[in-house]
Amino acid sequence: MKALTTRQQEVYDLVRDHLAQTGMPPTRAEIAQRLGFRSPNAAEEHLKALARKGVIEIVSGASRGIRLLMEEEEGLPLIGRVAAGEPLLAQQHIEGHYKVDPSLFKPGADFLLRVNGMSMRDIGILDGDLLAVHKTQDVRNGQVVVARIDDEVTVKRLKKQGNIVHLLPENSEFQPIVVDLREQSFTIEGLAVGVIRNGDWI
């Protein structure tokens, strides 16, 4: 499979997620609206590029005529090092898949993230662990989240007050990260729902 660009990966992920949630692919207009394209024609061009790369098939004559061809591997995707400016679940970040039942976690896990560092040591999240993550932006203060600040991904406990976000470590050797939402790019990538001790599954 040819590597996808960041934008192509976003379009592919949107089609896949829409299929999983509704049972049907999105229209070009829905893709354009969700991803901020100026017109459905822009969405069509990205779909044609995906078709040329062999990951989807465009069925002519139907507004929702999109069929996925890229086989989804079994298990939860394991995300390793994340490149700057790219979606967390971009294909190039996936190191492999682990046959873990997502329903073991509440809410269910969507992916695994390899933990880097000991900033969350005191609650049992250690360097090299595989953190089970539920993909959502619906999180509350006090929860452990996966967050992206500018182009850096981190795992911390969330505390939000107005335009200021405090990302709190669980290790006294580390300082909190303070984010001013008026000045920095900040995105919640998901909610931590469990830990797999690295080595138990590899």
UniProtKB/Swiss-Prot annotation:
Q: Which Gene3D superfamilies match?
A: Umud Fragment, subunit A, Winged helix-like DNA-binding domain superfamily/Winged helix DNA-binding domain
Query: What EC class is this?
Result: hydrolase
Name the Gene Ontology molecular function terms of this record.
DNA-binding transcription repressor activity; sequence-specific DNA binding; serine-type endopeptidase activity
Repressor as UniProt keyword:
yes
Which biological processes are named by the entry's GO terms?
A: DNA repair; DNA replication; negative regulation of DNA-templated transcription; proteolysis; SOS response
DNA-binding region coordinates:
28-48
* GO CC terms in record: protein-DNA complex
Site described as Cleavage, located at 84-85
* Alphabetically ordered keywords of this record: Autocatalytic cleavage, DNA damage, DNA repair, DNA replication, DNA-binding, Hydrolase, Repressor, SOS response, Transcription, Transcription regulation
Coiled-coil residue windows:
none
Family membership: Belongs to the peptidase S24 family.
Tell me the function of this protein: Represses a number of genes involved in the response to DNA damage (SOS response), including recA and lexA. Binds to the 16 bp palindromic sequence 5'-CTGTATATATATACAG-3'. In the presence of single-stranded DNA, RecA interacts with LexA causing an autocatalytic cleavage which disrupts the DNA-binding part of LexA, leading to derepression of the SOS regulon and eventually DNA repair.
Q: How does it assemble?
A: Homodimer.
Any idea what this protein is called? LexA repressor
Name of the gene encoding the protein in the UniProt record? lexA
